[in-house]
From Swiss-Prot:
Domain of life of the source: Bacteria
Bilayer-spanning residue ranges: none
Recorded catalytic activity of this chain's protein: GTP + H2O = GDP + phosphate + H(+)
Region G1: start-end pairs: 19-26
Organism encoding this protein: Phocaeicola vulgatus (strain ATCC 8482 / DSM 1447 / JCM 5826 / CCUG 4940 / NBRC 14291 / NCTC 11154)
Region of interest (G2), residue spans: 60-64
Protein family according to the UniProt entry: Belongs to the TRAFAC class translation factor GTPase superfamily. Classic translation factor GTPase family. EF-Tu/EF-1A subfamily.
Function, as annotated: GTP hydrolase that promotes the GTP-dependent binding of aminoacyl-tRNA to the A-site of ribosomes during protein biosynthesis.
Protein name: Elongation factor Tu
UniProt xrefs under InterPro entries: EF-Tu_GTP-bd, EF-Tu_GTPase, EFTu-like_2, EFTU_2, G_TR_CS, P-loop_NTPase, Small_GTP-bd, T_Tr_GTP-bd_dom
Keyword Transmembrane on entry: no
CDD domains: EF_Tu (cd01884), EFTU_II (cd03697), EFTU_III (cd03707)
Amino acid sequence: MAKEKFERSKPHVNIGTIGHVDHGKTTLTAAITTVLAKKGLSELRSFDSIDNAPEEKERGITINTSHVEYQTANRHYAHVDCPGHADYVKNMVTGAAQMDGAIIVCAATDGPMPQTREHILLARQVNVPRLVVFLNKCDMVDDEEMLELVEMEMRELLSFYDFDGDNTPIIRGSALGALNGVPQWEDKVMELMDAVDTWIPLPPRDIDKPFLMPVEDVFSITGRGTVATGRIEAGIIHVGDEVEILGLGEDKKSVVTGVEMFRKLLDQGEAGDNVGLLLRGIDKNEIKRGMILCKPGQVKAHSKFKAEVYILKKEEGGRHTPFHNKYRPQFYLRTMDCTGEITLPEGTEMVMPGDNVTITVELIYPVALNVGLRFAIREGGRTVGAGQITELLD
């Protein structure tokens, strides 16, 4: 059975467990691996191995996250579970763990709690497309009406935050029961995985999106022209393709006359490849780090956007003091550093280290941006926050 694991023919989806503290997120994660392991689709992970989440650094922010992998009959999943509420906020806002969908765990004994609401809101703001609800601890609730009430509250909460509250699957189960091998509750975990398989959509693959590459470095090859290097973020580039060069004020067009990787010439480069692209008719000083190359007409340069950000605490190496309206740090977008001015939401006087907040940013010059783009906020060479663009305003 163990050989199954390296089979990568199944589509890959990133998911996670979210929800209020002590509602059973980690127990459910352990239960999923345990039940699927019995079917030969996963390696068993104990509660303790998931709960002792290793620290990770993402854009200078320390986050505790556990990564678990398993498969169903149809898909391969990478599953993220975080021990603490602050870890979730950081994880979702900075995109350390991109989620294509999530399982929101709610204890039937408590019903929706403050973090249940907060995680649903965060999922909405960082564009997690769909959620599946797992009502946990149903073995501790005898009253059918109580279960129906909690289910109704969850549907209202989902609808309030623009998820499809009417059709979102809600599974009633017991993570602990499943973990302890009770057949009735094991079946509920399988039912949950079926719901995840069908309700959470397959993410578009980067390779199917239009070509885009942030420029990391530029050099000229005598007699051949200018080469821009970087990692292709999306799409495919062929020799002979026309590209647009965007950012730092003026936009230009060029044709790719060569694609090079590890000093070998290729016919094409695709998402994930680190390549050098030879550009026809472009002078070395016309293109620099921070610009992007993309398929013409796909991306526009913008200077004003709305974003959801997390501001680091002092202990995380962030600011020691709050910042106020019109604060002007650097925004590190892809390979580009650009100064921008922050406008806080109405009624917000200041932002404290450790807060997460929705801000409006105006950059001093237009940069190629898109919704969902993640960035770091820096000041004096250190990261003070991170976030992602939720709306373009110009």
